[in-house]
Amino acid sequence: MRPISVIVPTYREAGSLPGLLDGLASIRADGHDLDVIIVDDNSKDGTVELVADRGEPWVRLITRISERGLSSAVIRGLEESRHDVLVVMDADGSHPTSSIPDMEQALAAGADFTLGSRYITGGSTEDGWGVLRWINSKVATLMARPFTKVLDPMSGFIGIERATWQRAAELDPIGYKIGLELIVKCRCTNVVEVPIHFSTRRHGESKLSLKVQWQYLVHIVRLARFKYPRLSSFIPFACVGASGMIVYAGLLALLDVMAGTMVDTWIRILVAVLLTMTWNFLWDRRLAFWDAGSRSIARQYAGFVVVCSIPVLVTFFVTWYYSDKIVLPLAGVIGSAIGSTLGLFFNWVVNRLVVFKRD
């Protein structure tokens, strides 16, 4: 096995580090050349003292004072590494150190990227995963499908050759999914998944949060802009349109409760349509057409309203048609679905080329 540099990003993982370092020490005891770079975000939980007390010369600690974030910590570790084979793994004990030789063998056999996979044949997770965590993982994997066909693109246990990561386009990761960033930016085409058993952490707290999930969505948008520059605005545009359907139905329900028979149905529908268009405009401007030229927001809004008027009219009349046959919110769902589907590609093309055109 060739010499390996193992990068371990940490934040408040002092309780987990001894087990991880013991596992890595056992690999060295088998005669494999391996060093470890721990990149810690100034945890102040005893990490510095723990590494110093162990006194292992093959373990190097880098403490970052002002920087934060797992992905940037990994990049710092890659920059500080010494060997040509690079492995990144979590400190919490979820990744088995015993799989590192298998990952190195995959790279030696010609893979340009390898990762420890829970979902390939032979991989597994511990019992006790809740339904929400399972759904979260599957949805995140589905969202990564336009960028890679691997079964576990969310894995944080990855291996890469130094020459491969150094050819990367400008790395701009956010959140925790540095592996997906490297697969896309390094243009990795031969990705090999190594089956692993993913263990539940024994110490510390999980870093998964709503903020992390939001960062993942932003990351997906960034990667789409990189890999599919001509079509990258369509994905967030479609997502905003889908959210607009929910907003539209919710507004109709709210107006139905607040106004009832005091306000004509067509007025309630019109108010809901205009508010939904404003919602879509604000989010499209931020997510889909972020690179638009320097036209004023007022002119962009006016143009957006005009362009969207055709599918909006369809939405309006379909909702009105069904409003006396079924409850208004359900009529809004039907109208919004038909109008949004008909107008999706038309709105995207015209808004991209005219309203939000690049300078």
Question: What function would you assign to each model-found segment?
Answer:
Residues 34-35, 48-80:
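Conserved donor nucleotide-binding strand/loop of the catalytic core
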Residues 25, 32-43, 62-64:
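Short beta-strand/loop segment that forms part of the nucleotide-sugar
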Residues 1, 171-250, 284-310, 320, ...:
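Hydrophobic helical membrane-anchoring modules
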Residues 65-80, 97-176, 201-206, 211, ...:
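Acceptor/aglycone-binding surface of glycosyltransferases and processive sugar-polymer synthases
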Residues 86:
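Short aromatic/hydrophobic "clamp" motif used to bind/position activated sugar donors
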Residues 13-26:
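Short, well-formed alpha-helical segments that are part of the catalytic scaffolds
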Residues 40-48, 93:
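A conserved acidic beta->alpha catalytic loop
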Residues 3-5, 35, 181:
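Cell-envelope/extracellular polymer assembly enzymes that use nucleotide-activated donors
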